[in-house]
Amino acid sequence: MRDDVAFSLRRFKLPKHERLARVDAALERFGLADFAERSPHTLSGGQKQLLALAAVMVIDPILIIADEPTTLLDLRNRDRIKREFARLEQQLLVVTHDLDFLRDFDRVICIDNHRIAADGRPAEVIDFYQDLMAQRPL
């Protein structure tokens, strides 16, 4: 698993000790340090999701796009991701149907039928989305 995270750093020409330190820090950050030597194929779905996030975060991107980042995560790890996202300095774009996850965001946008249907504070947009979905037949 350590190699998978390190692969993200291949284009940065970092000294080996710095590359390893960054990889270990990313694994620790996402609660994966104890699994560093395991093959990703042996991980649970939630652990694979955390590994994917670690592989992105290790490069310290200026923009992070996360598509359903809480999928397959238990509540403990979902909260870990929420805390990690809250402390980011980077711009963060999250695509999710996990409405509770969005409650502390600065801004939420609801897309419906390929257009922006609502844009604003989380509580307002979440209420809008729930009302919109309640009006739709199953």
Residue map of PLM features:
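Hydrophobic anchor residue at the start of the ABC signature
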Residues: 53
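Catalytic Walker B motif of ABC-type/P-loop ATPase nucleotide-binding domains
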Residues: 64-67
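Conserved ABC ATPase signature
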Residues: 39-43, 47
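Conserved beta-strand-loop-alpha-helix hinge in the C-terminal portion
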Residues: 115-137
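Conserved ABC ATPase "signature" region
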Residues: 17-35
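Short helical segment in ABC ATPase nucleotide-binding domains corresponding to the A-loop/adjacent helical element
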Residues: 2-10, 20, 24
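Conserved catalytic motifs of ABC-family nucleotide-binding domains
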Residues: 60
